[in-house]
Curated annotation (Swiss-Prot):
The lineage of its organism: Bacteria, Bacillati, Actinomycetota, Actinomycetes, Kitasatosporales. This is Gas vesicle protein A1. Keywords: Gas vesicle. InterPro entries: Gas-vesicle_GvpA-like (IPR000638), Gas_vesicle_GvpA (IPR047870), GvpA (IPR050530), GvpA-like_CS (IPR018493). The gas vesicle shell is 2 nm thick and consists of a single layer of this protein. It forms helical ribs nearly perpendicular to the long axis of the vesicle. The keyword Disulfide bond does not apply. Residues 113-127 have a biased composition (Basic and acidic residues). Induction: Constitutively transcribed at low levels, repressed by argR. Gas vesicles are hollow, gas filled proteinaceous nanostructures found in some microorganisms. During planktonic growth they allow positioning of the organism at a favorable depth for light or nutrient acquisition. GvpA forms the protein shell. It is not clear what function GVs perform in soil bacteria. Pfam families: Gas_vesicle. NCBIfam families: PRK09368.1. It is found in: Gas vesicle shell. It comes from Streptomyces coelicolor (strain ATCC BAA-471 / A3(2) / M145).
Length: 144
C-alpha cells in the first residue's frame, strides 16, 4: 500500500514573523487620534496621538495625503494661552498709544485754536502797526 501525503489546500502557507513585519512596514499601520475638549471656547484638554508602525516612506506618504505633516501650522491653528495673552497685551498697548496720540493731537489743535483766537483779538484791539525791532548789531553800530 502506498501512502500519499496530504497536501495543504488553501492560504499562502505558513509565514514567519519576518514576513508579517515586512508586510506591515511596507503597507504601514497608522493609528491617528486627535481629541480636543473645550469649555466655553477655552481649550481645556488637547490630545494628539499618532502611533505609526511603517517605513519612513510610507509614513511620509500618509502624512502628505492627510495634510498632517505639521499639526500646528495653517489657518486652522487655534491660538494658545500665550498667543491670547500676547494679543491682548498688544491690543491694549495699541489702544493706549492711539489714545495718547489722539490726546496729543487734540492738545496741539487746542493750542493752535487758542493762539489763533488770541492773535485775532490782539489784531482787533490794536489798529496801528507794530514797530519793527532793530537787530542788536545795528544798535551797536548806531551807538558808535
Amino acid at each position: 500500500m502506498t501512502v500519499v501525503p496530504a497536501q495543504q489546500t488553501g492560504g499562502g502557507g505558513s509565514s514567519g514573523l519576518y514576513d508579517v513585519l515586512e508586510l506591515v512596514l511596507d503597507r504601514g499601520l497608522v493609528i491617528d487620534a486627535f481629541v480636543r475638549v473645550s469649555l466655553v471656547g477655552i481649550e481645556i484638554l488637547k490630545i494628539d496621538v499618532r502611533v505609526v508602525v511603517a517605513s519612513v516612506d510610507t509614513y511620509l506618504r500618509f502624512a502628505e495625503a492627510c495634510n498632517r505633516l505639521d499639526l500646528e501650522a495653517g489657518p486652522r491653528k487655534d491660538p494658545g494661552l500665550p498667543d491670547l495673552v500676547g494679543e491682548m497685551t498688544e491690543s491694549g498697548a495699541r489702544g493706549k498709544s492711539k489714545g495718547a496720540l489722539s490726546g496729543a493731537a487734540e492738545t496741539i489743535s487746542d493750542a493752535f485754536k487758542q493762539a489763533r483766537d488770541d492773535g485775532g483779538s490782539e489784531r482787533e484791539t490794536s489798529s496801528r502797526p507794530r514797530a519793527r525791532k532793530a537787530a542788536p548789531s545795528r544798535r551797536k553800530e548806531e551807538q558808535e
